[in-house]
Amino acid sequence: MKLVTNKKVGDYSYLFFSIIALLPIIFLFIEGKDIPQKDIESWTFVLNDVVPGLLKNSFQLVILSIIGSSLIALPLAFILELTDIPARKVWNVTTVLPLAFPLYVLAFIYVGFFEWAGPVLTFFREAGFDTLGNMKFKNAFGVAFVFSLGLFPYILLPIRLVLKKVDFKLYQASRSLGKSDGHFLKKVLLPLCMVPMFAGCTIVGMEVMADFGAVSVFNFDTFTTSIYMAWSSLFSLGSATRLSLMLLTFSLLLFFLESHISKRQVPLISNESQEAFFKLKLLPKMAALSFLGIVTFFSLILPIIQLVLWSYHAWKNELSANYFSLIKNTLMLAFSVGGSILIISLILVYAERNKHHKRWLPLFRSFFLVGYALPGNIVAVGVFLLFMNILGTSPMEMGLALVIIGLTYRFLSVGHRTISPTARLINPNFEKASKSLGKKRWTFIFKVWLPFLRGNAIYAFLFVFVEVAKEMPLTLMLRPIGHDTLSTKIYELTSEGEWERAALGALFLVILGMSTVLLMSLKGENHAEGH
Amino acid sequence: MLKVTDLSVKRGDNIVLENVNFNVHEHKLISLVGPSGCGKSTLLHSIIGFVKPLKGLVELHGKDLINIPIEKRSIGIVFQDNTLFPNLSVRENIEYGISTWEKGHRDNRVNELLDLVGLRAHESKLPHELSGGEKQRVAIIRALAPQPKLLLMDESFSSLDPVLRHKLREEVKEILKSLSMTCILVTHDRDEAMNFSDEVIVLNDGRVQQYGTPSEIYLRPANQFVAQFFGSGNIVAENCPSKLREGYYHKVEISDEGEVETIVVRKVFSNGFFYYDLQIPNSQTRFNHIACAHDFALEERVKVDLCEAWSFLDS
Amino acid sequence: MKYLSIASILLFTAYAQAKSLTVYTSRKEHLVKDIFKTYEKETGVKINYKTGKAGALIQNIKAELKDPKVDIFMTVDAGNLWYASSEGLLESTKSDVLTSHVPAHLRDRDNRWFGLSVRARTTVVNTNLVKKGTNISYEELAKPEWKGKLCLRTSKKVYNQSLVAMLIGTHGYDKAKSIVKGWVANKVDIFSNDTNVLKAVAAGQCAVGIVNTYYFGRLIKKQPKLPLAIMWPNQKSYGVHINVSGAGIVKNSKHQEDARKFLEWLASDEAQKQFAQVNMEYPILKTAPQTDIVKSWGEFKPNTAFNLTDAGKLQKKAIKLMHEVGYK
């Protein structure tokens, strides 16, 4: 009789590797505990002079962005789910496409658009409106404006999912009980929207805290920009580590808040009724369409037009051999990270196949997947510290491998959650049957298991591919010198205010992003739910 | 009390109800029964106002409802499922329609109704924590809370399992009777229609087939459809023995002294009774759904007695 | 046959690599490409170069220090050069050519790096808004008369950090702080690059801005009609703040001799002319000619009292100061 069964070995290996996966975070804590002597001056400066401002800025930004996004998302959800607005299918797509824009691209588009010498303010000044014409856009309100336009889908989608499940009969029942539309709205519809709205708001909060590129364009100081400043200008790894720990705390707080809120969702039975609740008369219909139009214009149409116009001006100069090497680097990185995540995800999912009843699985699985919940800057510092301790020298010696590992760690969750749900549907009896027929494990894997998951594997690869192409902070911090990608080039150009030159690469990334957003909405997957 | 005159309703391009006429008296429990798609839900919806008729009149206590909005009609409705507001507790659901009442009065009413269905202990629960039967009970008393003039039930028992269905139906019937409520229940279940109501409206293809008491419907079906729907006998087709008249509807009973011989071709046991389909040998004539306590075997010869015969053309 | 060709390839590449230098530079490629090619043509020594941000390059050199693949670190701004040397990344180079061609205040006190071209961080005015002959200085711009008229580049750029470091070195921390505070109090408009500062001044959004001379040169070359002109600040006091682009030999470099020769060449006549020309900077060698555009800006008094080594030393203080007064 075996003392240690294969199953036990499998369990222990999984546990072991999950602890390994947690190492970057562990090292953040280890290194952040004591500050090295040469960093003490920088850290004291950062702690006393910089951090209070960061807290204030972060707080401001999160609150304003949440308010802005909610103001867009809630009415939109009502209009799209509960009324008979025309062209619903079109709006379904246009309200989710803004997710294709990396926030830093939206940021530089609008900073360029609203800058003093730009079209809008110049027009106001020439028309005689001096206060408007000298308006400053580069403040918390400007950032929140951009964030709201880019992040409102994260609130819109959860609310829509809930409203979809509200049976038309409930509305009829309410009317039969003698109550007005307003009463139904107040007592049933709005309360039902609260949980998905708050869950969406925490996700917006997480994205705001994690953003690096957009706030850099606005010259707005946040934890992420300070981590980068400590890393690259102050050359204080100790400060960067400690700032990362602070940001880590906030991110995890928001993450747990979201899980907690989501659990409070009242279970709703799916309903098939297609009927629109509120059939709008002409005036409200016009108002709703205008609102939809305005949101679509600012979140989608204007950014694209501006990008295309700028690209057109710049493309003759920009489209040099240099640009092709940028694209090559971006694609290569995306390809290799996509491939490694695919392989690791498949291994993980296979390892998890008989463990779903085990109570320890969710916790330890989260160790593998935690990278996605954390801002890129933090992951970069953590991975850097890990290898600094393993190698004993600067991890920059690892070259491209460092940034590939960092990105794999960051986006593993994307691959895993695209494959795992379908893999769980595979009946464990298949494998037993295959074994009983005398086939080796590998035969089963290659002839049955993998083919079953082929579609999901392709999707996983594609989703990771796009996320890596768009990613900026981690790539910026861990890449070998001279190895620029589209995103890092955009950072460099936008930090110098060179909007036109940045637009060409940005356009490429946006098109890439749009194809996956469209793919996801066709597949029916909800991006916001899985975050 | 509820008078429907020449009601015609169109859904899309289809005429779903055509020239529907009936009169519902106060304090009566009515069943509206018919096959799927016959328009019974549409009829309910026209009464409550979810649907606007093409032509015709719906009057409640003599008042034309056409211009009265749903909120003001004082007609309650209980659906088949998914009826309770999911974010409100049992108590809050029931209070929903009477939220404008003075607090003491309102609380009394809610307590009274909760006790009626024995759900007082569950008053703080949310709908998803209740069983199917409990949910429907709550839905019914919620509809009753604002003391509507008329209660409509759209297949309200159809999603429950048979035993529960039967039990709940009896319970609700008692409650409605005790409250002297006027109620129209839509169902596709014949047993339900027969057992629940004082009167039955049989609907098919958007037209009223018959309106009468359950025994009238069963014993004297007005036409072929009603007869076949309730399975209570048969029209004699052709080649019938002399005692039977062609084209006539015959009511038969199994009896040792019977004059006509038949063979058992089908046998069903339901609710303590056997129901047989009996075929006259060498003939197309077949009597369906004849009840008898005795256990006959398939292919056994059974004698039947002619009780009554009439032609649909007469009535 | 296979092994023979492999061997010959290895031999060839080994030979080909016999004479080459590796340079890590933060200068833009198009500014250094041609100079490197010229050296190659003249001496046969191939210059391999990698470009990148100064901070990243420094990290990489640090990582390679025990066995460096790089020979020369070339960058802009004394702050970066100081940091590289303070981290022990650069060799102290003995060279009479270098010490004679590069003035003392433009090279490291221990000769670990040498300036190769000079740029001035000067005030540029809108000719319609500021009269000729107005007394202008970095300190002057802190006074309330200049409220609403000042445009500056962001404090995050190392050029401004060195400028403020210079002010600290000249006036002491507290006085420097009050000067920068004065800039901020004058509702200064912040821009992400020097060219945008210049454009804003030209458009009238502000009357004066502080930029590096070559940015002015580039813009004026493209759009000569702009109402912009250099007005040299601090001519009555210590002179205009200058900075350098420079280079040093990396510690433990495997080609110290060749690297030194290259640096000496860069600091000599022909290279200096090309170096300065390509980016409209001032040559480090006094006798090297300036380009016409640069000459047209006239003579000015540069700040020779401030040793640029100190710009690096004081950089951290400068960042702290700018943060304290809210200069973004």
Spans of model-derived segments:
Chain C
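Sec-dependent N-terminal signal peptides
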Residues: 3-12
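Early extracytoplasmic/lumenal segment of secretory-pathway proteins
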Residues: 18-82, 328
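Extracytoplasmic ligand-binding site segments that recognize negatively charged/polar headgroups
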Residues: 26, 30-33, 69-205, 238
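A beta-strand-loop signature enriched in Asp, Gly, Thr, and Trp
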Residues: 214-248
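Mature extracytoplasmic/periplasmic domains
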Residues: 245-305
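Extracellular/periplasmic bilobal clamshell ligand-binding domains
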Residues: 292-328
